[in-house]
Each structure stands twice: as C-alpha cells, then as structure tokens.
C-alpha cells in the first residue's frame, strides 16, 4: 500500500478521539440492558509506530525493542461472542487493517470463526482519493482499495452486510 503521512488526528484527549454521542448512548444502553460493561479499546499509544489496526501496530519492533504486539486478549474477547459486527472509520485504513489482522488470526487459530464476522459496509467510508490538482489524475484510489478489501473479506467467508439488513437471530 501507499504510506501516507497523516496530520495529527483523533489524538487521545481531543474531540476527534471521542465517540459520536449517538454511538456512545447506544453503547451505554446496551451495557445497561445486557448488564455488561462496555469495553473501550485504545490503540496507537506508542509514538513511533502507526496503529491503523486496533489489533496490532504497523511496526512491532524498533532497533530490536518491542514497541507493540498483536492484542491476543482483545481478539479472544471478540471471538467469545456469537457475532462480531464491525463499523468505523475509515474503510480504507483503520477498519480495513483491523479486519485484515482479524482475518489473519482467525485463519491461524480456527478458520470456522470467520462466520462470526459481520462487516457493516454502510457504517464506514473510505478516505477520499488523492487527486493531482494540476491534471485531475487519481494518484491514490483509497475508495477502490476499500472496496477491493471488502470483496476479499467476503470471499474469505466474512459477512459484508448493511445495517438495515434483517438479522436472523436463529442462525
């Protein structure tokens, strides 16, 4: 993939890191209704590595020193559920990389777990394409990368669905 240097965004403690109020309210309602504490997973706590994925940083070692690793605890917690619904931003980067890590671990541990994963394609969007301002040529097509990833996740056995799709609770 093309590595882009991003401006600071979604930094811990700033408004960009906060959940949209409606999503936070839904999480709290779910916690109360199910009598189960919501788990908020933090990522990107090491300043020398990108952490697109919530499961694993881009760089795990710097000069032989471990700066991050795959989050096995969180993976196991996710897989204890009957279904894992995935939504968020952006489908071309953080969500995509998280699902790639999830799929890789599922394939290594128990390929049948792939059937638990439901990707809400209408609850995410890609970073806009990078376009040459002089020629109008698309330099990096992030929307295409996101769509290609969704297609590959579907081919691997994950469910790519819409939030408006009927949920079969008997399955």
Task: Report the location of each language-model feature.
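Active-site-adjacent betaalpha module
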Residues: 1-171
């Amino acid at each position: 993939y093309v590595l882009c240097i991003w401006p600071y965004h979604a930094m811990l403690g700033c408004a960009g890191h906060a959940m949209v109020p409606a999503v936070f309210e839904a999480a709290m309602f779910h916690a109360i209704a199910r009598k189960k504490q919501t788990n908020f997973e933090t990522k990107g706590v090491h300043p020398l590595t990108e952490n697109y994925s919530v499961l694993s940083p881009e760089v795990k070692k710097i000069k032989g020193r471990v700066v991050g690793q795959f989050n096995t605890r969180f993976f196991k917690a996710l897989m204890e559920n009957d279904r894992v619904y995935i939504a968020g931003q952006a489908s071309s980067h953080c969500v995509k990389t998280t699902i790639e890590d999830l799929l890789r671990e599922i394939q290594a541990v128990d390929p049948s777990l792939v059937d638990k994963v439901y990707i809400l394609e209408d609850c995410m969007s890609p970073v806009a394409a990078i376009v040459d301002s002089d020629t109008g040529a698309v330099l990096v097509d992030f929307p295409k990368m996101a769509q290609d990833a969704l297609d590959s996740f579907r081919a691997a056995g994950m469910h790519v669905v819409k939030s408006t799709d009927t949920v079969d609770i008997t399955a």
